[in-house]
Amino acid sequence: MVSIAFYGGIPGGISTPITQQSEKSKYEENTMFQPYCYNNDSKNSMAESKEARDQEMNLKEESKEEKRRNDWWKIGMFLLCLAGTTGGILWWYEGLPQQHYIGLVAIGGRLNGSGQSNAIECWGSFPGCRPFQNYFSYETNRSMHMDNNTATLLEAYHREITFIYKSSCTDSDHCQEYQCKKVNLNSSDSSNSVRVEDVTNTAEYWGFKWLECNQTENFKTILVPENEMVNINDTDTWIPKGCNETWARVKRCPIDILYGIHPIRLCVQPPFFLVQEKGIADTSRIGNCGPTIFLGVLEDNKGVVRGDYTACNVSRLNINRKDYTGIYQVPIFYTCTFTNITSCNNEPIISVIMYETNQVQYLLCNNNNSNNYNCVVQSFGVIGQAHLELPRPNKRIRNQSFNQYNCSINNKTELETWKLVKTSGITPLPISSEANTGLIRHKRDFGISAIVAAIVAATAIAASATMSYVALTEVNKIMEVQNHTFEVENSTLNGMDLIERQIKILYAMILQTHADVQLLKERQQVEETFNLIGCIERTHVFCHTGHPWNMSWGHLNESTQWDDWVSKMEDLNQEILTTLHGARNNLAQSMITFNTPDSIAQFGKDLWSHIGNWIPGLGASIIKYIVMFLLIYLLLTSSPKILRALWKVTSGAGSSGSRYLKKKFHHKHASREDTWDQAQHNIHLAGVTGGSGDKYYKQKYSRNDWNGESEEYNRRPKSWVKSIEAFGESYISEKTKGEISQPGAAINEHKNGSGGNNPHQGSLDLEIRSEGGNIYDCCIKAQEGTLAIPCCGFPLWLFWGLVIIVGRIAGYGLRGLAVIIRICTRGLNLIFEIIRKMLDYIGRALNPGTSHVSMPQYV
C-alpha cells in the first residue's frame, strides 16, 4: 500500500510528491535529499553528467598513460633486439679467420731503459715522431745472433712492430700505376757515356736491371732499378714496392726532406733500429742486420753511413736516350766501400742510409766484390713506412726544411728488455696477428661478449665523454707538472754549477788562508827566538795575495785578488739563493698542481671506479655486463616517467594548492549544510509520520516521484553524493534550505553575503570558484584562519614531489630485488625438486614394492 506523506516544492517549481513504500532499505543518517523538481532525464543528467565527464577524462588519461607505457616498452624491446642483432653479427665476425685487425697503437717514441744490444737508437729528431707512454713492452733473454736459424728480438720486432707504422699523405701520388718497359744500359769502357736501349732480355748494369717508367700524364720519364718496382700480372704495368700494404691515412705531412736530388715530403717517420757489428772497435761502422723498416725500398740488409768522400763517391755518367719529350729523370750512381759488412741472408743487395749535413739519401747497393759496392739513389719509394711525394709540374713543395738524423750507439751486449715510453696519443692502425712472437693479439672474451659489446655501448658513450674530459684534464695537469719539473731541474743544475764555482773559489781562499797562517806561525817563531824585528825581513815575506796556493806560494806578489774573491763569493751566493728559491717555488707549484684534483674529472673517475668496483667479476665476468645492461634498461625505461613526474610536481604546484583548498572548503561547507538540512528534514518527517522517523529511514530509498518511478535514483546514491561534492557551487545555503517549507522567500539573499555566520564566507566562496584561485589571496585567507592548509607552501609541495620521485626510484630497485629473489627461489626450488625426484627414483629402484628376487631357502 502506498500513501502520499508530503507535498513540497519551491517557488515557481513543480510540487513533488514524497512517497513511502514498505520496502526496507539500509539506514544512513548522513544522506541529504533535495526536493524532486525534475523529471527522470533531468535527475539523471544532474546526478550523472559530471561523473560521466570525469570518467571519460579518466579513461582518456589512462589510455594516454597506457600508450606511453607501451611506447617505452617498445623502445626497450627495440634496444634489446638491436643488442641481440649486433651481438650476433659480432659473434659471426669473430668466427671468420682474420689476418689483420685494427688495434690501438701509438705512433713514434723512444726507448727507455731498454738494454738494447749493439743497437743505434734513432729517436726524437725524426720528423713526425710522437712519444710513447708505456703502451706495450717486450721482454726476452735471447741475445743477438748472426745465425739464420735463430729468431732474434730485432727480427721479431721487424715482424710485429714495424708493420704498424703505415701512414700516407692524402695528396701523395706515389702509389700510382706506371707504364714501364725494360731497358739495357750499355757503356763504353773509354768514356762515361751510357746508352739506353729498348730490349726484351735485360742485363745488369751497375748491379741492377733497369726499367724506364712514365709518370703522371707522361710528362716525366724515370729510369729506376727493377728492384724498386713490382710487376702486375706480367704486363707493362708496375707499381712501387710497399703499395700493396694496408695504409692508414693522415691529413698532412709534418716536414720536407731532400730525397736524392728531389725535395720530398715525409709524412710520418717511425723509429727504427740499426745494429753495430760485434767486436768492431770503430763505432762509425754500422752493420746491416737490423730489422726491415722499409726505408724507401730497403731490403732486409741495411746500414747507415756518414756521407763523406771516404765511404761513397759519385760517379758522373752521361745518360743518352733517343727520342723523348718532357723530363727524363736519371739516377745518381755511387761507388762505395763498406768494411766489415756481413749479409744477414747472404743476399747481394743491401740498403744504405747516407746522411749528410742537410740531406738524407737512400741507396740501393749491390756487392760486386768483398768490400766494394755499386749503389744508386732511389728515385722514389717508401721511407719509414711513409709515402714520398715527388714534385709535379703544377705542385711544388714550398718552404723546404731538411732534417738531420742524430743517432747514438748503445754498446750493450744483451738484448733483454725494451719498453716504449712517453706516449701522447693512440692511433688505430692495422696490426698483424699471425706471427708466432712479438706483439700478439689478445682476444677478449668475444664469443658471448659480442653481446656484451652491444650491451655496454650506452655506458661506453657516457664513459668516453667522462674519461675524455678526465684524460684531457690529466694531460694538461701532467704537462704543467712536467713544465714545473723541467724548471726545477734546470734551476737545480744551474744552482749546482754556481755552487761548484763557489766551492772552487772557497777552496782557493782556504788554501790561501792556510798559507797566511803558516807565515804568521813562522813570524811568531822568529820573534820568540830572536826578539828582533830585523830578522823577520830575512824570512819569507808575509804578503796578502789572492792567487791560489801552490808549491811556489812563497814567491807570490801582493795583489787585490782576495777582494775579487770576496766580491765573487757574494755574487754567487746571491745567484745561488735566487736559483734555489725559484727551484723550490717550481717544485712546490708542481706538487700543488699534481695533488690538486679537478672536481669534475675526479667525480668522473670516482663514478666509474665505483661502478667498476661494485659490479662483480670485474674483467671477463658476464654477470657484470648483465647487471650493467639491466641498469641501463631500467634507466632508459624509467627516466621519462621520473622526469614527467618531476615536471608535473614543479609545474602544477601552484594550481594544485588552489584546487586542494577549494575542495576542502566545499567539503566542509557541504558537511555543515548536510547536517542542518538533515535535521530540518527529520523534524518535518516527524510531523508528517507522527514521530516515526525510523520508519522513514527504513523506506527513504524507496521514494517515488509524481509518477511513482524512482528506480534510477535509488540505484545510484553514491553517485548522487559525489555529484554534490563535485558541484559545490550548486549548493544552496542554510537560509535557502529553510525556505523549502516557506514558499515565496528569496533564495539569492544568502548568496550575496547578507546572511550566514561567517562574514568572509561569501567572498571566499567567489574567490575559490575562480579558475586556479589566487595564491596571494589564499595566503591572506590562511593568515586570517579561514583555510586549514595554506596554498603558498610551494617548497613543501616541491619537497614532497622529490620525496615521491626518490621513493619511486627506490621502489623500482626493491621490486627488481624482489624479482631476482623470486627467480632465485624458483631456481632453488627446481633444483631441490630435481634432487628429491632423483633420490625418490633411486630409493624406489633399490626398494621396489614387489620383490622379484627369490631368497634362497635353507632346509
Swiss-Prot record:
Residues 498-513 are annotated as: Immunosuppression. The keyword S-adenosyl-L-methionine does not apply. Residues 7-614 are extracellular. It comes from the Viruses. GO terms for molecular function: structural molecule activity. Specific enzymatic cleavages in vivo yield mature proteins. Envelope glycoproteins are synthesized as an inactive precursor that is N-glycosylated and processed likely by host cell furin or by a furin-like protease in the Golgi to yield the mature SU and TM proteins. The cleavage site between SU and TM requires the minimal sequence [KR]-X-[KR]-R. Residues 576-624, 663-699 form a coiled coil. Residues 636-859 are cytoplasmic. Pfam families: EIAV_GP90 (PF00971), GP41 (PF00517). The record marks 444-445, 684-685 as: Cleavage. Residues 446-466 are annotated as: Fusion peptide. The chain crosses the membrane at residues 615-635. One of its GO terms (cellular component) is virion membrane. Residues 1-6 form a propeptide. Glycans are attached at residues 40, 112, 141, 148, 186, 214, 233, 244, 313, 340, 368, 399, 406, 411, 483, 490, 550, 557. CDD domains: HIV-1-like_HR1-HR2. GO terms for biological process: symbiont entry into host cell; virion attachment to host cell. Keywords: Cleavage on pair of basic residues, Coiled coil, Disulfide bond, Glycoprotein, Host cell membrane, Host membrane, Host-virus interaction, Membrane, Transmembrane, Transmembrane helix, Viral attachment to host cell, Viral envelope protein, Virion, Virus entry into host cell. The mature envelope protein (Env) consists of a trimer of SU-TM heterodimers attached by noncovalent interactions or by a labile interchain disulfide bond. The surface protein (SU) attaches the virus to the host cell by binding to its receptor. This interaction triggers the refolding of the transmembrane protein (TM) and is thought to activate its fusogenic potential by unmasking its fusion peptide. Fusion occurs at the host cell plasma membrane. The transmembrane protein (TM) acts as a class I viral fusion protein. Under the current model, the protein has at least 3 conformational states: pre-fusion native state, pre-hairpin intermediate state, and post-fusion hairpin state. During viral and target cell membrane fusion, the coiled coil regions (heptad repeats) assume a trimer-of-hairpins structure, positioning the fusion peptide in close proximity to the C-terminal region of the ectodomain. The formation of this structure appears to drive apposition and subsequent fusion of viral and target cell membranes. This is Envelope glycoprotein. It comes from Equine infectious anemia virus (strain WSU5).
